[in-house]
Amino acid sequence: MPLAVFAAPTFSALIAVVILSYMTVGICMWYSMSWQQVLRDLSVLQCGINFLPFGIGSVAAVALSAYLLPRVAAQWIMAVGVVCVLAASLLLATQPVQQTYWQQTFPAIVFLGFCPDFVYLAAQIIASNSVSRKHQGVASSLIGTLNLYGNALGLGVAATIETEIVKGSTEDGSSQGENSVSGYRAALYFGAGIAAVSLLLDFAFVRMPKNDREGWEEEIEDVEQEPDVLVASAIQRPSAA
């Protein structure tokens, strides 16, 4: 990984926005399913059906972001994605333990479906415009990798928060059900908090660099050009007798 890519304008801030937003996505996906299975005692099949709006929202987000990218600055499209996951985490964190699916869980899952594609597509455009051509592949790969790392990192931190909250509630004499609810809410509020930080970073530091480059006229300075070596081969033919 060349360190030069992190010196590009807005690139470091872009990395922070992407990883924080994907941390929240992972937290919301895990705890929305856990809430339905553990606290509401729904079957795995019912939980899978309840999560179908996520896929529908993701498909709609791809089409909508493709329409918006030529018309709206990429950082604002990314901001819309972060707002969606922020709204999803707040809806999930504030829902009662027993509530109809359509009241808060359904809109939260729909909002959640819009975040990954809005953030990912906008981040790819910004990353490609922020670095030189020789680093565009590396920058794009890094954005894709942050999806997985963000999900894993977010779940790791959220699970630690949940465990500590449950441990503290148990020492206070609370019931097991109350402990689980408190831990889930704390993890989801943590996700909302880092999504809010991601949104602030996007507004403050992430910008779409202007790209005036045409064709492949940009010279790559650090690539050594080897001189052409001409090898002449002499072909001797036997003389006629």
Predicted region positions:
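Interhelical loop segments of eukaryotic multi-pass membrane proteins
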Residues: 1-5, 170-176, 213-219
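12-transmembrane solute porter fold
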Residues: 1-169, 180-205, 209
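Intrinsically disordered, low-complexity terminal tails of fungal membrane proteins
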Residues: 208-241
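Short linear motifs at secondary-structure transitions and domain/linker junctions
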Residues: 51, 179, 220-224
